[in-house]
């Protein structure tokens, strides 16, 4: 009982702006399919778009409904090309779908770059104004932040938000 009480006191709420601040620490990390390693003084790291979301959630101590790190559910056996419904199914197990007109800073966005949705990004408030994306862009070869352009908006298919329980962190 005492351990549970101590654990409850140690929890802190993670805000949407903290999610974005943490994601920005990944800027410049190189692209690597299925990678999960943030850049550091030791090297450039390597991450893909899903790895960025998993890494940020892990660094912030975000949990699933049972109190396990969200990264525990991470999968790295996926193709570079969409597998019908797999990504949407995995995301919807852990994140709450929200209407596109309700998306806000810190939300996870899903894009269709080919036939099926296959790319994720975090929504930010872009430093020069307007909405932005923080994502691992394979074309850029690294994690970048860029404006949410009309091109990206046309490819946007879904928006998700971390559930309130997940925003309780043990860190």
Segments predicted by a language model, with ranges:
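N-terminal capping segments
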Residues: 9-96, 100, 105, 112-114, ...
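Residues that flank catalytic or metal-binding motifs in active/ligand-binding sites
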Residues: 105, 129, 155
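Short, Lys/Arg-rich amphipathic alpha-helical interaction segments
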Residues: 118, 138-164
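Catalytic Cys-His active-site segments of thiol-dependent hydrolases/isopeptidases
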Residues: 122-145
């Amino acid at each position: 009982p005492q351990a549970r009480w101590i654990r409850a006191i140690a929890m802190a709420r993670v805000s949407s702006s903290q999610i974005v601040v943490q994601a920005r620490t990944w800027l410049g990390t190189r692209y690597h399919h299925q990678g999960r390693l943030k850049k550091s003084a030791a090297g450039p790291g390597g991450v893909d778009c899903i790895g960025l979301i998993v890494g940020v959630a892990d660094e912030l101590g975000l949990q699933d409904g049972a109190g396990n790190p969200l990264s525990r559910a991470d999968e790295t056996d996926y193709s570079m090309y969409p597998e019908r419904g797999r990504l949407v199914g995995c995301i919807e197990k852990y994140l709450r779908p929200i209407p596109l007109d309700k998306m806000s800073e810190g939300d996870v966005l899903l894009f269709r770059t080919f036939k099926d949705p296959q790319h994720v990004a975090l929504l930010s408030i872009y430093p020069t104004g307007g909405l932005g994306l923080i994502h691992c862009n394979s074309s850029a070869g690294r994690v970048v932040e860029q404006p949410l352009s009309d091109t990206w908006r046309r490819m946007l298919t879904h928006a998700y938000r971390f559930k309130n329980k997940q925003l309780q962190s043990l860190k």
